[in-house]
Amino acid sequence: TFTTSRGAVSANKVYGTTASNILIFVEAGEEGTDDWTAFGQSFDQDVYSNVTSMWGSPPDTDSNGKVVVLYSKFSTSHINSGFAGYFDSKDLFENESGSNGADMVHMNLYRTTDTRYTPDSTKDTLAHEMQHLIQYGYRHIDRNFSLMDTWMSEGLAECAAHFALNKALTNSIAYYKSDPDGYFRNGFPLIKWHGIAADYVLTYLFFQYIRLHATDGTNIYPQIMQTSTGDYQSIETVMKNQNSEFPTFGDLLLKFTVANLINGDDIYGYGNERTSFDMSSPPAPTSVSGVNLYSGGIMYVYTTAETVNSFSPSGQGTNISYIKVNKE
């Protein structure tokens, strides 16, 4: 029996051997017809090795050398609770109330009331949650660092999902480009976390952008995780040694902003992956007034080249930047 966000859940082991890196449990009666053995072997051999080779080993507080993965219903009515998985740090501390006393992550069985996740469709989420487990173990248990800012923690976890699948998260890119809710064109911030899909999309793009312009490529991710500050200064510290274009975090934000506007083949774009991260169609202009901008928020105003060339900003201050861009 496990403790979950829903309460106590009885579960049966469907995958795990003495040689495996993970143990998979599924809520009793919900095993279905899925081939859990094939999924477990695939995750063990491919995804687990990808995640741990990049981020390091997970903690092993229960001394069994394995990560426990529990698939259960997040709601008794099968209605999706809004997320596909989670990591709960209290599971690592046996004496905490509600702890499972195990290195584990929790996965949702149901996408909607009538639609069940297939195991293969959860690989990216499982990698995401495992990165949270590894990150917490390294920063909080091994080093006693402060917890990382949420937007960064989630951005690094989305990177784990990207490399678990070994491809770009196309749904995230499509969401950014279509901007169906008008978030991005109306000042949605990178750094202020709201806990909605737009947050994950924006921080995912940001961390892919910096990877593509870093000398060390994917190796910057563990470097950022292992930097003690755990905020934007961690990124600044790492990136200013990776590319002379980014002496400050402000420079990084500015160039990331322009990259999402013009899709260049240099620093103002996504480098040799600009086809995957295709930003060639400009975002829609800002559609609301009276926007409160937070760190990383952007507003787009389209006008004539003549107006752009003659524009002189006023009231700019130190925290708001005007960027004039001629796409021609």
What are these regions, as identified by a protein language model?
Residues 14-15, 21-26, 68-70, 104-108, ...:
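Ordered hydrophobic segments in well-structured contexts
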Residues 121, 148, 194, 198, ...:
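Short, solvent-exposed segments of well-ordered alpha helices
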Residues 230-328:
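Beta/coil-rich, acidic/histidine-enriched accessory regions frequently appended to metallopeptidases
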Residues 100, 120, 140-214, 225-260:
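Acidic/His/Gly-enriched intrinsically disordered linker/tail segments
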Residues 20-149, 156, 166-170:
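Juxtacatalytic substrate-recognition/specificity segment
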Residues 40, 48, 52, 127, ...:
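Non-transmembrane alpha-helical segments in soluble domains
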Residues 1-31:
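Acidic/polar low-complexity interaction segments
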